[in-house]
Amino acid sequence: MRFRFVLFLFLFSITIFAQELVSTKSPDSISHWTKKNKLGFDISEITFVNWSAGGNSAVSGLLKGDFSRVYAKDNQKWVNDLSIRYGLNKQDGHEMRKTDDAIQINSTFGYRKDTITNWYHSAKFNFNTQFTNGYSYPNTQKAISRLFAPAYIFLGVGAENASKKKHRIFYISPFTFKTTLVLDQRLANQGAFGVTKAQYDSNGNSIVDGKKSKTELGFLFTSYYKKEIVKNINLVNKVVLYSDYINNFGNIDIDYDFLLDLVVNQYVRASIGARIIYDDD
């Protein structure tokens, strides 16, 4: 069982580069594609000089990108999203440490019976992994995670309700396959992230290597809510709940994301957020 809680706060964050195309359509009137591209780099710095109360000077950087391609025609909708995040922090007296690392790909195809209803018959694909090695600081001798170790793949069918007026989307799937990949043999041998660990003889020699994948069939619920609650203050709330039918049904894996984005101007912003991940395995 693992439980992770990440709380991050950027009091003064400067966006050095950002590009956003909220709704761009091809000049060709028959195109049904829209796209959104957003890339930014936030940096924050704290400096102490002869500060008697104590504290360490620190500098942090966060690269983030959000890209989407949406096809919509009549009763059909196909939404494709790519989200990347990579953050580093350097404090006096400490080595460079990673603060955020994520690659997320989502693709949802939906079909509704008419153009009035908000309900879609949907098929959904999700893929999540990371860029670089993760460590249990200050120990950086052995990685506790790597690219594709783990990686999570969700593939299933269900129903989605998308309401622009209510600024939310939720998806329910009674049949979703979840595959966990651990493409690092050392971590797989340890049984990391729920895969079957290696078997050893009485002398400690490996008899059977740990498995590098694990597949489950279960129930999936996802919810996404985004709204400008007041001018220049945006709220983003995401939750993913999954329970395996075969192993310990009722024990729920949770991935919860909360972000409050406060925009001062084009260059200065503050973000307050939290992420909670609970995996029963």
Regions found by a protein language model. Name each.
Residues 37-39, 80-82, 121-125, 157, ...:
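Membrane-embedded beta-strand positions of outer-membrane beta-barrel proteins
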Residues 41-47, 73-75, 84-90, 125-133, ...:
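Transmembrane beta-strands of outer-membrane beta-barrel pores
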Residues 57-63, 99-105, 149-155, 213-219, ...:
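Residues that define the transmembrane beta-barrel architecture of outer-membrane proteins
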Residues 247-281:
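Predominantly the C-terminal beta-signal and adjacent terminal strand-loop region
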Residues 29-45, 76-78:
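Transmembrane beta-strand segments of Gram-negative outer membrane beta-barrel proteins
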Residues 49-55, 90-96, 140-146, 206-211, ...:
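Extracellular loop and loop/strand-boundary signature of outer-membrane beta-barrel proteins
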Residues 41-43, 63-71, 105-111, 127, ...:
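Residues on the lipid-exposed face of transmembrane beta-strands in outer-membrane beta-barrel proteins
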Residues 75-78, 115-120, 167-169, 232-235, ...:
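Repeated loop/turn-to-beta-strand initiation elements of outer-membrane beta-barrel proteins
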